[in-house]
């Protein structure tokens, strides 16, 4: 006959007492808040006036790419933000940081554990076998006497916030890169089209020169000059084709596609966008902007640097607190009710108490505290550097926008004059007044002026995008899916 022996038994009352014990221990937390360092923003030398500043209207830049009123660009940006690998990696990093923050926060509360066991004993003399069952519920808790646990929680939370801003910074960069590639493809398509027209025009020039040579009107040198000009244009045309291929491949990578895929035909959403064949002939959005310091604080890289600074300060506090005595309380529930009463009457005496005295490791403590302080000072320098770089980015972007606009006006005048000179030389050559080289040179000058004007148009668009990115703006990153 088998006999069952229960070494541990829990009643509902016992479980309630155990839960009450855990809650009581939790009230001991927070005793070390007095050891936290107060955050003081680093001193910054911010200029009273900017070199390139006009103050007229409130800046609104989000979503800034829509200010160009190009539906195909809007569609492309949306697709990149939903498929790009860099943004996916940044999202995974953010999720990991948030999970780590949650794990750290759990250290504030008592940790419960339970185990069940069973054994069977069979006497060698053939007597009755016995079975026994064991059940234990234990509680462990580190009292946050000096704020170490709280500092670790702060460090993890600030790190998670910094990770969120890193993701937003990745988003801002992706949008700017997408817009730049979109316009670059349009610019190169337009250059390729102009190049094809110029080659066809050069062929006509060569044919005309050949006929004149055959009739004895010009020398062979004129024919060779026309051939040289056409060969140079064909070589330049090949280079443009290569640049266009590189731009399309770069866009395919942004869209999470293999290189050589046609971005216009294989969007993951099933939509298609019409590849831009020329730069948009619309006015570049005008942003009249004063740049106060608080405007740049919204930039994700600046916010991330600030959060990293706060995280470093909390880490410094945690390192400092880790060398103060730490008190760990452990208790087990599974005995008689009288033992539970004793535990609640005198918790520190009844619970297992482990007192660790790390401050005895004096040399190691000093070194680790110095390392933590250096990490904090490094974060201060990085924050100051990031903010100053933000001011530099905006100042440079405003200057570039202004100078490209000025250059555009002058290049338009240059193209107009070059086209007029070409027409005059063509007429003179056809009438036999000048040699073919003068006409060929005029053609080259006109082509160069037209290419420079087109490139300036591309530069104005990208400079505007760079300014929008430098200003930061509100968050544009896609929201995270619910965990």
Predicted regions and their residues:
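Terminal intrinsically disordered/low-complexity segments used for targeting and assembly
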Residues: 2-6, 15-19, 25-82, 157, ...
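Intrinsically disordered, glycine/charged-rich N-terminal periplasmic/extracytoplasmic linker segments
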Residues: 71-117, 131, 138, 142, ...
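Transmembrane beta-barrel architecture of outer-membrane proteins
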Residues: 73-75, 132-134, 180, 225, ...
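Amphipathic alpha-helical coiled-coil segments
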Residues: 89-104, 170, 174-197, 201-206, ...
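Small/polar (Gly/Ser/Thr/Ala-rich) solvent-exposed segments
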Residues: 108-130, 140-169, 188-191, 267-269, ...
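Hydrophobic, lipid-facing positions within transmembrane beta-strands of outer-membrane proteins
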Residues: 133-139, 291, 349-355
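Repeat-solenoid scaffold signature
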Residues: 214-243
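Metallo-beta-lactamase
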Residues: 240, 300-301, 307, 456
């Amino acid at each position: 006959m088998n006999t069952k022996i229960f070494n541990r038994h829990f009643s509902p009352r016992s479980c309630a007492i155990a839960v009450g014990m855990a809650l009581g221990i939790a009230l001991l937390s927070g005793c070390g808040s007095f050891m936290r360092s107060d955050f003081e923003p680093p001193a910054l030398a911010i200029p009273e006036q900017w070199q390139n500043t006009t103050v007229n209207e409130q800046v609104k830049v989000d979503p800034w790419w829509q200010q160009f009123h190009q539906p195909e660009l809007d569609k492309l940006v949306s697709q990149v933000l939903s498929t790009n690998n860099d943004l996916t990696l940044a999202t995974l990093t953010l999720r990991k940081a948030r999970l780590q923050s949650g794990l750290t926060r759990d250290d504030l509360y008592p940790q419960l554990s339970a185990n069940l066991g069973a054994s069977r004993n069979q006497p060698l003399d053939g007597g009755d076998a016995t079975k026994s069952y064991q059940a234990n519920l234990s509680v462990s808790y580190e009292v946050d006497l000096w704020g170490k646990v709280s500092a670790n929680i702060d460090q993890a939370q600030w790190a998670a916030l910094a990770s969120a801003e890193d993701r937003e910074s990745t988003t801002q960069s992706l949008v700017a890169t997408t817009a730049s590639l979109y316009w670059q493809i349009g610019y190169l398509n337009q250059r390729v089209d102009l190049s094809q027209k110029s080659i066809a025009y050069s062929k006509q020039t060569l044919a005309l020169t050949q006929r004149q040579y055959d009739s004895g009107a010009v020398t062979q040198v004129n024919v060779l000059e026309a051939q040289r000009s056409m060969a140079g244009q064909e070589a330049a045309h090949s280079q443009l084709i290569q640049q266009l291929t590189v731009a399309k491949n770069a866009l395919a990578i942004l869209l999470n596609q293999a290189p050589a895929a046609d971005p216009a035909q294989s969007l993951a959403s099933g939509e298609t966008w019409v590849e831009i064949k020329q730069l948009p002939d619309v006015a570049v959005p005008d942003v009249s902007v004063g740049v106060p310091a608080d405007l740049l604080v919204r930039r994700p890289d600046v916010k991330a640097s600030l959060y990293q600074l706060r995280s470093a300060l909390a880490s410094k506090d945690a390192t400092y607190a880790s060398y103060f005595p730490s008190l760990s309380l452990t208790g087990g529930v599974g005995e008689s009710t009288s033992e539970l009463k004793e535990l609640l009457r005198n918790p520190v005496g009844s619970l297992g108490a482990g007192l660790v005295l790390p401050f005895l490791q004096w040399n190691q403590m000093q070194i680790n505290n110095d390392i933590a302080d250096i990490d904090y000072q490094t974060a201060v320098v990085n924050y100051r550097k990031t903010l100053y770089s933000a001011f530099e980015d905006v100042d440079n972007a405003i200057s570039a926008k202004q100078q490209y606009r000025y250059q555009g006006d002058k290049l338009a005048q240059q193209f107009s004059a070059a086209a007029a000179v070409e027409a005059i030389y063509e007429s003179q050559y056809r009438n036999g007044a000048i040699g073919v080289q003068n006409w060929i040179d005029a053609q080259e000058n006109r082509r160069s002026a037209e290419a420079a004007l087109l490139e300036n148009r591309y530069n104005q668009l990208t400079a505007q995008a760079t300014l929008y990115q430098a200003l930061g703006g509100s968050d544009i990153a896609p929201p995270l899916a619910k965990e």
